[in-house]
Amino acid sequence: MDIVKILKKLELEKTGHYENEFYIIDLEDSDEAARAYTKLDKNAVNIEYPCFTVNSNNNTNKVTNYFELESDGNTYLIFLISNYLDDTYYVKIGEKK
């Protein structure tokens, strides 16, 4: 996976780290998460539902936004995770196999 190319396309050029098969980008706060959502919504495609949001555990404390992006014949899964309970926000990017 050419993560630099994907991040550039998503306008999310920020340093992250690998965890298992995902590249994780920690976001500073809910404002940065909102900006990331806007960039993802503009540049990525969710095949089934544009702007589809899943509320984890049927509550609004943790929200996961799911996007897909195709690049060079590969499909990438992108998750924007906002956990309002413990104030953590991050993006996970991985190649769909």
Label for each model-derived stretch:
Residues 17-18, 22-92:
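Acidic, low-complexity, intrinsically disordered interaction modules
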Residues 1-22, 26, 97:
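Mixed-charge, Lys/Arg-enriched low-complexity segments
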